[in-house]
Each structure stands twice: as structure tokens, then as C-alpha cells.
UniProtKB/Swiss-Prot annotation:
Designated name of the protein: NADH-ubiquinone oxidoreductase 78 kDa subunit, mitochondrial
Protein species of origin: Candida albicans (strain SC5314 / ATCC MYA-2876)
Any GO MF annotation of the entry: NADH dehydrogenase (ubiquinone) activity
PROSITE patterns attached to this UniProt entry: 2FE2S_FER_2, 4FE4S_HC3, 4FE4S_MOW_BIS_MGD, COMPLEX1_75K_1, COMPLEX1_75K_2, COMPLEX1_75K_3
Boundaries of the annotated transit peptide in chain numbering: 1-23
Broad class of enzyme this protein falls into: translocase
Binding-site residues, [2Fe-2S] cluster: C58, C69, C72, C86
Length: 720
């Protein structure tokens, strides 16, 4: 069985593998416009470079070529027949015509054949208004049909594939985009074709749910209305929606998204193209958890009265906090601020400045991590240095204490992409997981990592041109965090290929959107655990427990959802979610990006930094900024790169080398406890207050279960 899998695996690599990049360019003429393009490119790519749009259904520049819709036919001089432009590589001197009468007739024929069996569902189809078939039919379709089959049009039973994707298979035109995406990109080969010709159907063959955290992308890829969003079904038309370009903050990748709203309600979330970050994909949590923005929201200030909360005005709530602070009069570290996963940089710096102005340095995040293991003095020690896009250049990868499929689903597709297209070898140390690529597990603890780096894996990493070590954020939560960072630092400092020119092969994969900005701003001041906090300020902090909150402490919770953190509070202040404010975030690779307000916050909720600024006056510690621009100037004072958006601040080779040595020196006294590393996320669909409040994510839990794990003794499941 294993040999069969290995044979199929090798075959799939040969099938998917792309030829190496050619520097040579050829000159092509498209509709009279001469363009130079890389040899090996297709005619349709040359046409796009020339500014000519060729209609297509099956072609997608992020998927393998299929060439089965024939809509992209073009006329090439000295060729007897029309050519499918998506599948034909360019040749030097080629002359292409894309809009002749001959081509128009061919496209009209293709359109007529597609519409032959297509139902007239446009009035009730969710794809209406943004449907490729609808648009091309207006240009190439006829006002009447010639189909007179006695038995009527083809009828196909709809497939039940889960709570996220709604199927209307009568509309399917067999472009196979969904099949190629699920097999090649998502790594979940559950979609395929059965039958031939008019009898061909697309589905799962044996009826089952699509179990992938990237399945929603087939909705965007479908050029007709065969696959649509089940939670969004029949809720709105595209021309009714206001579109806002922003970013996702439900993980640390920072996927570029578009938020569509109607009134104050977020109707849907779609991906935006950014080849450096998420290409054209987003995870199902990013796409479908937006209904959590409507439930369990905090809309007005609340003050605890016994076992109940009572509504209050802003003045009453802030006055109550000021009175409690004055009564407690916390000294030094007795005032503590804890920030959560979704907090923007402006709010972090505002809270830090307020706490510092009140005489305390006790600021931290809500995930118990040993920051001292990697520190926050040298930035290259806590970001993803190779960059997300740089993963495609890697030729050897070692994963340490991470499951990228859950922690960064979009980044995981990059690893699979390069694994399919090359002879990339991937090893892991830590808890085993159901990967979408072939990975060799070397053990579960720091001792296994030590052995791996001293053995054949270490030898391969040392000989690789661009090696990659990815350390998961969960490592900092283990007893062996210091020992692991010491081992990684020692190994990297001994091998020049880990720090050569623009390449730094040591990477930390975060899972929280606020984490890198918090480290950049120093929002992790180390205060002795013996210091008992008497006044605690929770800023969107919901990953805390009873042990983190002393019984006699006064607690203020500021956030946008009534989750765990709010249950500890004496006073609750309603803040804004990421779709309701303009905020700065830094993703795991150190790229600074910003959210934009797509709608207004509900009730009397306000932006977080404004709440903190107002509170500072009540506490007689007025902060020196009155608008968002002043706050961002303050960000620039502390960390200048935080005001330069969509760029990654480069770390010099010399600084990176100092960083490796710092990992060793900082942890030189570390001992190995041999505690097994655990993946920090075992429930992909419930990782933050928004997803935990989402009815759609709850349905996913009900359908798929909390975990997508395999049996320990089973051979790793290879998807190809």
C-alpha cells in the first residue's frame, strides 16, 4: 500500500510540476499590439499583458490548465484551426487575433452548447449580477434556442457537501475549476468527475461533506451559479452592497479581503488579490465567521451589580472606573493591562501609554508565552523572516511545534504549492497532524529536535540553498521553549545558508493578529509573577482563566463581544470590531497593513483607542492625542516601520546574525524537560470571539467535529 501511495505521489508531482523559470523573452503580436513575454507563457497571458481580455470559463491563472471550455479560442496566423489560448504557449513572432468574425462565430457556438442544458435560473440565482456565463451570454448568446430534445434538459441531483457550500448542479458547465482547486491547492481531493460527455457529473462520488478549511474558495472560482455560499443564500444582490477593501484579523496571515455591507450589516467577506500574502484565497473561517459580528455584541457600557450587569452611560461607566482606581490606588505592577488577539496597534500603544503614565509597566497579552525565549529586542527573532511568498523558494523545511493547516491555512497552501512543484522535503517535530503534504514526523519534544538537527535532517538543512525552519507560536507556551530556541539559534548561527543576503531561514509563525505589533511596541514588559494585580484592564482579552484574575481585583473589560473576558469584569466598555474601525495590524512576516471601517459599530460602542483616550481624562492622566493621526505619529515614534504600510522592514544580515547569537545567549542555561509539544489549535473553527459567536462556525463544529485529526498510529494521510 505504501509503495502504491509513493508511486501516485511521484506521478502527481510530475503532473503538477512547473518548468523552471526562463529568463528568455519572446515577442508576440496580439491584435496589432507587440508585447514581450517570458517564453513558455500562454497566449491568454500575452493577451492580458497587451491589455486584451479573452473570455474564459475554465482558465484561472492560479490553477492548472484544463482547456476544456473552448471559450478562449483565438486565431493564430499560419495555423489552420482556432487555438485554445489558455493551453497554447507563445512562440517568437507569433501573430494572434482575438476578435475576428471567425472567432465570434466559434464563441457563439460554444455559448449555445453551454446554454443548451443550462436552466433559466438567473432571477433566483445568487450568482446573478456577477456571473461569467451571464455576461458572456449577453455578448455571444442568441435571443432564442434551437434545443428541442423530447426528454428535456439535463437534470442533475444537487450534492450535499456541507454547511458552507450550496450546490445547484443543473447549472454546472464542467469547467472543473472546483476539482482542480480542491486537489491542487486545498489538498483535499474529495471533488472529482464521474461519467462522460452529457452524463458527466461533478461531486464527491460517495456522498460526503467537503472537509477542508479552504473549501469556500470554490464559490469564487465557480463561473456560474453551481456553487454558491449557503449562509449568504438569497440574502442580497451584489448591486445592493457597499464594498470595502480591508484585511482579515482572525489569524496572523493578514489576508487581504473585501467586506460587503448593506446598511450596518456585514453580508459577506470575499478575498482580494495579493500575491505576496494570500494570493486569491482565504480560509473558511475568514469567509464565513462574519455572521459572528451580529451576535453576542456589546452595545452599551455595563456595570456589575451583584451577579448581574446593569446598563450605564459612558460617563457613569468611566466615573465608576476612576472611583475604583482612586480607592485601590495600585502601586507599580499592581495595575495590569492584558491585550487580546484582535487588538489593533493604535489601541495597544494607547493602553500602554496610559498604564505607563499611571506608574506601571505591567502589560502583557492573554496567551501565556515565554517571551524571554525569543525576546523582543531583535525583530528577526519573532517574525516570519523568509516571508510568506518566500516559502515558494524553499528547498528544505522543518516544522517545529506547529500545524500550519490550522494556525495559518492560507500559508499552508503555499507549502503545499512548492511541495507539489519540486522535490521539497518536509519534516516536523511536535504533535502529529493531518497534513496536506508529505511530512516526516521526527518526534514530539525538544530532545527529538536536538537529535534531528544533529542527524540527517540537520545535514540536509545545512546543505540546502534556502532552508526553512518554522517555529510555531505554541512553542513559547511549552516548558522547553528556551531550549528549543537555543537549539534553533545554535544551528542557524553555524550554517551560513540560514542568513545569506536577503534570505533568513529562521521563522516564527504567529497565530494572533495583534502579536507582532505587541512585540514591536514592547507590550510584553516582564513583571515578577509575585506581584499581585489589584486593578486589571482587559483589552479584548478572552483567552484568560480564573487563575489569571485575583478574586479581589477590580476588572475592566473593553471589547466587542460578550465572551469569557467580559464574565470577569466589574465594568464593561463596548469597543469596535475590525470591520468597524481603521486600525493598524502587523502580520506574522512583519508586514504592516490596515483595516478600514466597512460599517459603524452597534449601539454606543466606540473605537478602542478613543475609549482609552476618554478614560485617561477621568484618571487625571490625559493622553496627548486627540485624533487617529496623532496616535499613529506616536506609533512612528516607538517603531517607525509601523507607519509604512504594505512593506516589510528589512533586517540586515549583521542584525540577523546578532539575533541568532541572542537566542543562544539568552537561553544558554536552558534545560530540556522533554515535554511533548502540542499544537496550540485543535479546533480550527473556534479560535477567537468572533468565530465563537458565529452560528455558521457552530454548524461546522457540529458537522466536522472540533478536531480534524488522524489516528496516531496511522500513516500520515497524503492528499494529492
Amino acid at each position: 500500500m505504501n509503495s502504491i501511495k509513493s508511486h501516485i505521489l511521484r506521478s502527481s508531482k510530475r503532473y503538477i510540476s512547473a518548468s523552471s523559470k526562463r529568463l528568455a523573452e519572446v515577442e508576440v503580436t496580439v491584435d496589432g499590439r507587440k508585447v514581450s513575454i517570458e517564453a513558455g507563457s500562454s497566449i491568454i497571458q500575452a493577451a492580458e499583458l497587451a491589455g486584451v481580455t479573452i473570455p474564459r470559463y475554465c482558465y484561472h491563472d492560479k490553477l492548472a490548465i484544463a482547456g476544456n471550455c473552448r471559450m478562449c479560442l483565438v486565431d493564430v496566423e499560419r495555423m489552420p484551426k482556432l487555438i485554445a489560448s489558455c493551453a497554447m504557449p507563445v512562440q517568437n513572432g507569433m501573430v494572434v487575433h482575438t476578435d475576428s468574425e471567425r472567432i465570434k462565430k466559434a464563441r457563439e457556438g460554444v455559448t449555445e452548447m453551454l446554454l443548451e442544458n443550462h436552466p433559466l435560473d438567473c432571477p433566483v440565482c445568487d450568482q446573478g449580477g456577477e456571473c461569467d456565463l451571464q455576461e458572456q451570454s449577453q455578448r455571444y448568446g442568441s435571443d432564442r434556442g434551437r434545443f428541442h430534445e423530447v426528454v428535456g434538459k439535463r437534470a442533475v441531483e444537487n450534492k450535499a457537501i456541507g454547511p458552507l457550500v450550496k450546490t445547484s448542479m443543473n447549472r454546472c458547465i464542467h469547467c472543473t475549476r472546483c476539482v482542480r482547486f480542491m486537489n491542487d491547492v486545498a489538498g483535499a481531493p474529495e471533488f472529482g468527475t464521474a461519467g462522460r460527455g452529457n452524463d458527466m457529473q461533478i461531486g464527491t462520488y460517495i456522498e460526503r461533506n467537503i472537509n477542508s478549511e479552504m473549501s469556500g474558495n470554490i464559490i469564487d472560482l465557480c463561473p456560474v451559479g453551481a456553487l454558491t455560499s449557503k449562509p449568504y443564500a438569497f440574502r442580497a444582490r451584489p448591486w445592493e452592497l457597499k464594498r470595502t477593501e480591508t484585511i482579515d484579523v482572525l489569524d496572523a496571515v493578514g489576508s487581504n479581503i473585501r467586506v460587503d455591507t448593506r446598511g450596518i450589516e456585514v453580508m459577506r467577506v470575499l478575498p482580494r488579490l495579493n500575491d505576496d500574502v494570500n494570493e486569491e484565497w482565504i480560509s473558511d473561517k475568514t469567509r464565513f465567521a462574519c455572521d459572528g459580528l451580529k451576535t453576542q455584541r456589546l452595545t452599551t457600557p455595563l456595570i456589575r451589580n451583584g451577579d448581574k450587569f446593569e446598563t450605564a452611560t459612558w460617563d457613569e461607566a468611566l466615573s465608576t472606573i476612576a472611583a475604583a482606581y482612586s480607592k485601590i490606588n495600585p502601586q507599580n505592577g499592581e495595575l495590569k493591562a492584558i491585550a487580546g488577539a484582535l487588538v489593533d496597534a493604535e489601541s495597544l500603544v494607547s493602553l500602554k501609554d496610559l498604564v505607563n503614565k499611571l506608574g506601571s509597566e505591567n502589560v502583557t497579552t492573554d496567551v501565556k508565552q515565554s517571551v524571554n525565549a525569543h525576546g523582543f529586542d531583535i525583530r528577526s527573532n519573532y517574525i516570519f523572516n523568509s516571508t510568506i511568498d518566500g516559502i515558494e523558494d524553499a528547498d528544505q523545511i522543518l516544522l517545529v511545534g506547529t500545524n500550519p493547516r490550522f494556525e495559518a491555512a492560507v500559508l499552508n497552501t503555499r507549502i503545499r504549492k512548492v511541495w507539489l512543484r519540486s522535490n521539497l522535503e518536509i519534516s516536523s517535530v511536535g504533535q502529529d497532524f493531518n497534513s496536506t503534504f508529505d511530512v516526516t514526523n521526527l518526534g514530539e519534544d525538544a530532545k527529538a529536535l536536538e537529535s534531528a538537527l544533529q542527524g540527517s535532517v540537520g545535514e540536509k538543512l545545512g546543505q540546502a540553498k534556502k532552508p526553512l525552519i518554522i517555529v510555531g507560536s505554541g512553542v513559547a507556551e511549552s516548558k522547553d521553549s528556551e531550549a528549543i530556541y537555543k537549539l534553533v539559534g545554535e544551528f542557524a548561527s553555524k550554517h551560513e545558508n540560514f542568513n545569506s543576503g536577503e534570505w533568513n531561514g529562521v521563522n516564527l509563525l504567529h497565530r494572533e493578529a495583534s502579536r507582532v505589533a505587541a512585540l514591536d511596541l514592547g507590550f510584553n514588559t516582564l513583571v515578577e509573577d509575585s506581584t499581585k494585580a489589584k486593578f486589571i484592564y482587559l483589552l479584548g482579552a478572552d483567552e484568560i482563566t480564573n487563575k489569571d484574575i485575583p478574586k479581589d481585583a477590580f476588572v475592566v473589560y473593553q471589547g466587542h463581544h460578550g465572551d469569557l473576558g467580559a464574565s470577569f469584569a466589574d465594568v464593561i466598555l463596548p469597543g469596535s470590531a475590525y470591520t468597524e474601525k481603521s486600525g493598524t495590524y502587523v502580520n506574522t512576516e512583519g508586514r504592516v497593513q490596515a483595516t478600514r471601517a466597512a460599517t459603524n459599530p452597534p449601539g454606543v460602542a466606540r473605537e478602542d483607542w478613543k475609549i482609552i483616550r476618554a478614560l485617561s481624562e477621568y484618571l487625571n492622566a490625559k493622553l496627548p492625542y486627540d485624533d487617529i493621526y496623532s496616535v499613529r505619529l506616536r506609533l512612528g515614534e516607538i517603531a517607525p516601520h509601523l507607519v509604512r504600510h504594505d512593506v516589510i522592514e528589512p533586517v540586515s544580515q549583521e542584525i540577523a546574525k546578532i539575533g541568532f547569537n541572542d537566542l543562544v545567549n539568552k537561553n544558554k542555561s536552558a534545560t530540556i524537560f522533554e515535554e511533548p509539544l502540542k499544537n496550540p489549535i485543535d479546533n480550527f473553527y473556534f479560535t477567537d470571539v468572533i468565530s465563537r459567536s458565529s452560528p455558521t462556525m457552530a454548524k461546522c463544529i457540529s458537522t466536522f467535529g472540533a478536531k480534524i485529526e488522524k489516528v496516531k498510529d496511522e500513516k500520515p494521510d497524503i492528499n494529492f
